[in-house]
Amino acid sequence: PGATWTSGSTCEIIGYTCRYDKPDGKKDVLPFTWCKNIETGAEQFRWKGFAMPRPLYGLETINNRPAHPILIVEGEKTADAARKIFPNFNVVTWSGGAQASGKHDWSPVHGRSSTIWPDGDEPGINAAHEIYQALKNHCENIRLVPPPFMDGWDLADVTPDFDPKAYAKKSALPAAEYFAPAHTVIEHTEP
C-alpha cells in the first residue's frame, strides 16, 4: 500500500486502513481487520470492514490528552496532516469516505469541545452535517470551519500561500449557525 493507518486504542490494534494509489490517479482504501471465525474460533487479520459501530481513527489521542479540544476531519491522510498543523487538538476521523460517517462510534467525542473541518465538496459538507447531528445533543461547543475552497480541498492540500490557522480563527462559527435552515421569505398577497 501507498499508506497504512492503524486503528484501535493504544494497547489494542483492531485493524488497519490501507490506501492503494492507482495509475489513473484514483485510489482504493481498504480495511484490514482482526476477525474471529464464529464457527472455528480462529482469529486472524482479514480484508474485511470494521465491525459497526466503527472506531474513530485517532481515538488514542482523545484518551491520552483529555484536556485538548477535538478537530474532526475527513480521512486518515487529512487527519495526519491536520495533526501537524494543529498540534494542540486531538484530531480524529472516520474510515470509509464521506458516506460512512454515520457508521462510526462518536461517543468518545461526547462532552468535548469539537470543531468540524469538512472537505470542500458536497459529500464533505453532508458528512459534516451528519456528524453535527450525531454530536449536537452530546457536546456543548461544536464549531465548523467552512471549507476555504470547494474543489475537494482538504487540510492535506495546504500550500505555503494559505495559513489554515489564521483562516480557522477568522472563519470558524457555531455549527448550529452554519447548518441553520435558510431564512424563508413568505410573500403576502392581497385578498
Where does each model-flagged region fall?
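Intein modules and their embedded homing endonuclease domains
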Residues: 7-78, 177-191
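TOPRIM fold recognition
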Residues: 23-28, 44, 61-70, 76-182
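Short acidic, Pro/Gly- and aromatic-enriched capping/linker segments at domain boundaries
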Residues: 1-7
